[in-house]
Amino acid sequence: GKMLAAVSRVLSGVAQKPASRVLVASRTFANDATFEIKKCDLHRLEEGPPVTTVLTREDGLKYYRMMQTVRRMELKADQLYKQKIIRGFCHLCDGQEACCVGLEAGINPTDHLITAYRAHGFTFTRGLSVREILAELTGRRGGCGKGKGGSMHMYAKNFYGGNGIVGAQVPLGAGIALACKYNGKDEVCLTLYGDGAANQGQIFEAYNMAALWKLPCVFICENNRYGMGTSVERAAASTDYYKRGDFIPGLRVDGMDILCVREATRFAAAYCRSGKGPILMELQTYRYHGHSMSDPGVSYRTREEIQEVRSKSDPIMLLKDRMVNSNLASVEELKEIDVEVRKEIEDAAQFATADPEPPLEELGYHIYCNDPPFEVRGANQWIKFKSIS
């Protein structure tokens, strides 16, 4: 037994030494490279974002790590869900990593972002750790909402969630943009919704107010082709979501290309900051998972369709190929990042399964900022719930 343990220790020691380190050290990489990106379709705009962009080695490595982290985190959530450690609603965004990472790359940390319930990726790109996100999914005290929000209700600084009601975040986003303007801040709000929510009346009401008041609001339709199990063609009389703001200018963007998303976001944010009012972006993307964990995702589309997107337009693969072919990084170096990311996810999952759940007496915490002054029929219902942080 001891002998075996010793042998396995030696072997694992050998396995852990990154052989590629020597290679990487001796090789020189380009500091940056210029790439052609797909031209955006425009609505009510004379010109759009540039069709070439420069990617630095440093940014490329950062984007790659972030996208890979979101992908692995979602796959880990899938695994924990199947083990019944995560319960209830759970909407995964694998396939859409170029959207959350690309949008973040195009704005400042002081800008604002609000989205619907497919929010894990944005929660991460807005600055929370994988630990806090996975622990929130498993309902533990170390989660970003102390385990009470779950998959659809996570928040970070300048990130207003996760919202469980379809489309309800859009008027809220217009409100955040109103606050930016009212307070005289040079900030914008990215207001996201899906193709399923795009047919909601409240979205058109928000368009109208935002245009009337020239709010710095970037309305972003993440079009992943299916609202639950309904394809866009079956749900919308016009699937040109970028044109549906009518009097609001729009862009249709390749949402599988992080550089396309980044440039379009920079363009849209600059448009809003210049005081011209709102602008619309449609990100054409794709989700590999079903709508939620209860949806296998193959009754309304074929496995072949999913496989084709994976093999031809995967956002992570696209970035990787560009970086390797332009001498911005080596395959070995990117593999090393993959190993580090996997380890980070494993550690986070360990924490998310070992961390304690909040006790029942904390049920009423954080409902009121302090003990509420009112009584109902002569009794204070909340007396037993002390509100403490």
UniProtKB/Swiss-Prot annotation:
Q: Where is the transit peptide?
A: 1-28
Q: Name one GO cellular component term.
A: pyruvate dehydrogenase complex
Q: Where does thiamine diphosphate bind?
A: Y117, R118, G164, V166, D195, G196, A197, N224, H291
Residue positions binding pyruvate: H91, Y117, R118, A156, G164, V166, D195, G196, A197, N224, Y226
Q: Where found in the cell? A: Mitochondrion matrix
Provide the GO biological process annotations.
glucose metabolic process; pyruvate decarboxylation to acetyl-CoA; tricarboxylic acid cycle
Give one GO molecular function term: pyruvate dehydrogenase (acetyl-transferring) activity
The entry's Mg(2+)-binding residues are D195, N224, Y226
According to its UniProt record, which cofactors does this protein need?
thiamine diphosphate; Mg(2+)
Where are the N6-succinyllysine residues found in this chain? K62, K243, K276, K312, K384
Q: Which reaction does it catalyse?
A: N(6)-[(R)-lipoyl]-L-lysyl-[protein] + pyruvate + H(+) = N(6)-[(R)-S(8)-acetyldihydrolipoyl]-L-lysyl-[protein] + CO2
Entry-linked SUPFAM superfamilies = Thiamin diphosphate-binding fold (THDP-binding)
Where on the chain is Phosphoserine found, per UniProt? S231, S292, S294, S299
Q: What class of enzyme is it?
A: oxidoreductase
Question: Cross-referenced InterPro entries, in alphabetical order?
Answer: DH_E1, PDH_E1_Alpha_Subunit, Pyrv_DH_E1_asu_subgrp-y, THDP-binding
Query: Which key words are in the record?
Result: Acetylation, Carbohydrate metabolism, Glucose metabolism, Magnesium, Metal-binding, Mitochondrion, Oxidoreductase, Phosphoprotein, Pyruvate, Thiamine pyrophosphate, Transit peptide, Tricarboxylic acid cycle
**Which of the residues bear the PTM N6-acetyllysine?**
K62, K243, K312, K320, K335
Q: Which residues carry this modification: Phosphotyrosine?
A: Y300
Q: What is its EC number?
A: 1.2.4.1
The post-translation modification note in this UniProt entry reads: Phosphorylation at Ser-231, Ser-292 and Ser-299 by PDK family kinases inactivates the enzyme; for this phosphorylation at a single site is sufficient. Phosphorylation at Ser-292 interferes with access to active site, and thereby inactivates the enzyme. Dephosphorylation at all three sites, i.e. at Ser-231, Ser-292 and Ser-299, is required for reactivation. Acetylation alters the phosphorylation pattern. Deacetylated by SIRT3.
Q: Please state how the activity of this protein is regulated.
A: Pyruvate dehydrogenase activity is inhibited by phosphorylation of PDHA1; it is reactivated by dephosphorylation.
Share what the entry says about its subunit structure, partners included.
Answer: Heterotetramer of two PDHA1 and two PDHB subunits. The heterotetramer interacts with DLAT, and is part of the multimeric pyruvate dehydrogenase complex that contains multiple copies of pyruvate dehydrogenase (E1), dihydrolipoamide acetyltransferase (DLAT, E2) and lipoamide dehydrogenase (DLD, E3). These subunits are bound to an inner core composed of about 48 DLAT and 12 PDHX molecules.
Per its UniProt record, what NCBIfam families does this chain match? Answer: PDH_E1_alph_y
Q: What does this protein do?
A: The pyruvate dehydrogenase complex catalyzes the overall conversion of pyruvate to acetyl-CoA and CO(2), and thereby links the glycolytic pathway to the tricarboxylic cycle.
What is this protein's record name?
Pyruvate dehydrogenase E1 component subunit alpha, somatic form, mitochondrial
Q: Which organism is it from?
A: Sus scrofa
* Name of encoding gene: PDHA1
